[in-house]
């Protein structure tokens, strides 16, 4: 099959059907059995370091700074009161944050230093004491030995943090008394510092955990309630959106109840003040699990996918985890979109629907002003996302499935032909904004699908040029799959104008993570920069930071560790101070 070997492949729209079909062929051939990936998920260690990595090739000196990554670390806790505790879902792996310092030296050779720190020691200590995990989780399977009374009572315990999803830098509006807790003046190797006022780790809960940018030490937690007293709901979005020009931060807060309530808000970078842009409380606007949303030049846009919570959200309190609190997928349950004005105080200005689907990650959104046939100026909104046909992917991230324990991969994905729904499609919708605000909660309007690029020509964990957020753009970088392993197995640059794809593939057993695009200072071309990705070598149980040319996806260099590093979720590159 055309893409099964290592290399860089240039593919066009004409190859889409062939390459998508090869995913199915690889899955049916059970190719994952010859792709070891346990090193990306299990028995991961903390290395406070800093440790110097071995550089092969080159990393441009202009990329000086720190690449931070976060995600699940260890997945088991030994020697608890009830034996070994096993985490069942990858999203519940105990948080660990990593820092790769990229430091040019006087002799011209770039050095890369690595350190990491666990972020959930308090929760791990609680598990050791009790022998089981209390508090809210994403998908931890219930312990049959734990009584229903103990299960329910954990809802009322103080929340134990497991912030393991995304990183936010220079967050405005956080309580000033926390500033004294951050060293950020403690230099790393060779006096290295990064240019940031603060650094936080987020999850799909309203709290974000502050960490020391230099030592990675976990510090105080800030909740959305600290930003504004009306933001009291328990759920939010890991991926806050940021205006690339002003730096203003946007997110939403979801409160459960008889009528669930969404509050979409902005934190002003200049003043630190938080403004609630819209409050939406309507029985036709269901509570749902959402991991990301959209930002355009003038609007915040929420897409509520088919992942609705049961009992108007209150089932989360009964189940104690997100997966078991969601209603089963229903193809009649359309995605509902909320368009909120972010410039002029108009609140909810439009709603529309698209066919039932699920997504973790928005990619980007933007606006275009056009003249219709009558010469009237209209505004079209465009939304790009990594869309799944249904919600099967969520349970595909149980550790048993990812590491193929007891043939779990085949048992899960082959049942009811679920494998047909394992790969996302880059999907673009277009919606014409009404000339006057139309906050119709019947969602009678609809958007048009205008672009669809299937895997492996596009993928998951998408990133773009950071200054193109909310604006027209051309390129997206993502981690894609060819069906050779239980997660992703390739990196891809997708041209949205031509549907061309440049696909990087490593040797067998080399599992890449999210690509992080770093633009070259002063560059004009959107793809003039480099792409970093953490790659886990499952054969030798080691890892390396891969550096690719942003234009060609050819390797420039890599910094190798002689131990495994968790594949993780998301990262951020911060320039040197």
Swiss-Prot record:
Compartment(s): Cytoplasm, Cytosol
Pathway assignment reads: Carotenoid biosynthesis
Q: What is this protein called?
A: Torulene dioxygenase
Enzyme group, top EC level? oxidoreductase
Which region ranges are annotated with the description Disordered? 1-20
Q: What is its main location?
A: cytoplasm
Q: Which domain of life is it from?
A: Eukaryota
Function of the protein? Torulene dioxygenase; part of pathway that mediates the biosynthesis of neurosporaxanthin, a carboxylic apocarotenoid acting as an essential protective pigments and leading to orange pigmentation. CarT mediates the cleavage of torulene into beta-apo-4'-carotenal, the aldehyde corresponding to the acidic neurosporaxanthin. Is also active on other monocyclic synthetic substrates such as beta-apo-8'-carotenal and beta-apo-10'-carotenal to produce beta-apo-14'-carotenal and retinal(beta-apo-15'-carotenal), respectively.
Q: Which organism is it from?
A: Gibberella fujikuroi (strain CBS 195.34 / IMI 58289 / NRRL A-6831)
Q: Which Pfam families match?
A: RPE65 (PF03055)
């Amino acid at each position: 099959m055309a893409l099964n070997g290592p290399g860089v492949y240039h593919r066009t729209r004409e190859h889409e059907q062939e390459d998508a079909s090869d995913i199915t062929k690889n899955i049916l051939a059970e190719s994952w059995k010859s792709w070891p990936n346990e090193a990306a998920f299990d028995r991961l260690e903390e290395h406070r370091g800093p440790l110097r990595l071995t550089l092969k090739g080159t990393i441009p000196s202009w990329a000086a700074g720190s690449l931070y990554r976060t995600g699940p670390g260890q997945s088991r806790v030994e020697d608890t009161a009830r034996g070994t505790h096993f985490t069942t879902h990858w999203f519940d792996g105990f948080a660990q944050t990593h820092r790769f310092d990229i430091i040019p030296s006087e002799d011209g050779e770039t050095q890369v230093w690595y350190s990491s720190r666990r972020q959930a020691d308090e929760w791990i200590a609680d598990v050791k004491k009790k022998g089981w995990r209390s508090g809210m989780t994403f998908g931890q399977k219930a312990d049959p030995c734990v009584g229903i009374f103990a299960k329910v009572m954990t809802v009322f315990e103080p929340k134990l943090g497991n912030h393991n999803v995304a990183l936010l830098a220079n967050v405005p509006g956080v309580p000033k008394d926390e500033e004294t807790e951050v060293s950020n003046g403690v230099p790393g190797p060779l006096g290295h510092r990064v240019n940031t006022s603060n650094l936080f780790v987020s999850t799909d809960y309203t709290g974000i955990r502050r960490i020391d940018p230099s030592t990675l030490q976990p510090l105080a937690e800030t909740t959305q309630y600290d930003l504004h007293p009306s933001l009291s709901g328990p759920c939010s979005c890991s991926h806050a959106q940021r205006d690339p020009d002003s730096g203003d931060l946007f997110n939403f807060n979801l409160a459960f109840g008889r009528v669930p309530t969404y509050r979409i808000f902005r934190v002003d970078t200049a003043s630190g003040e938080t403004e609630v842009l819209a409050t939406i409380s309507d029985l036709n606007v269901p509570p749902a699990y959402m991991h990301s949303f959209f930002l355009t030049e003038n609007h915040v846009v929420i897409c509520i996918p088919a992942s609705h919570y049961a009992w108007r959200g209150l089932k989360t309190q009964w189940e104690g985890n997100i997966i078991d609190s969601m209603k089963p997928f229903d193809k009649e349950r359309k995605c509902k979109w909320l368009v909120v004005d972010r410039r002029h105080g108009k609140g909810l200005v439009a709603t529309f629907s698209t066919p039932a689907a699920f997504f973790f990650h928005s990619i980007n959104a933007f606006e275009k002003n056009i003249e219709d046939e009558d010469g009237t100026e209209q505004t079209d909104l465009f939304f790009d996302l990594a869309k799944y046909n249904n919600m099967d992917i969520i349970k595909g991230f149980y550790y048993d499935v990812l590491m193929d324990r007891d043939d779990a991969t085949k048992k899960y994905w082959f049942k009811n032909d679920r494998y047909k729904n394992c790969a996302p499609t880059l999907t673009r919708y277009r919606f014409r904004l009404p000339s006057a605000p139309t906050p119709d909660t019947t969602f009678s309007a609809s958007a048009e699908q205008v672009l669809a690029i299937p895997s492996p020509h596009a993928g998951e964990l998408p990133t773009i040029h950071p200054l193109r957020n909310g604006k027209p753009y051309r390129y997206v970088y993502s981690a894609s799959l060819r069906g050779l392993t239980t997660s992703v197995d390739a990196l891809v640059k997708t041209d949205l104008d031509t549907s061309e794809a440049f696909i990087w593939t490593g040797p067998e057993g080399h599992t890449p993570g999210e690509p992080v695009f770093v633009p070259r200072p002063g560059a004009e071309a959107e793809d003039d920069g480099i792409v970093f990705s953490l790659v886990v070598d499952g054969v030798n149980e080691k890892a390396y930071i891969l550096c690719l040319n942003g234009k060609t996806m050819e390797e420039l260099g890599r910094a190798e560790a002689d131990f495994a590093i968790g594949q993780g979720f998301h990262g951020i590159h911060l320039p040197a101070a």
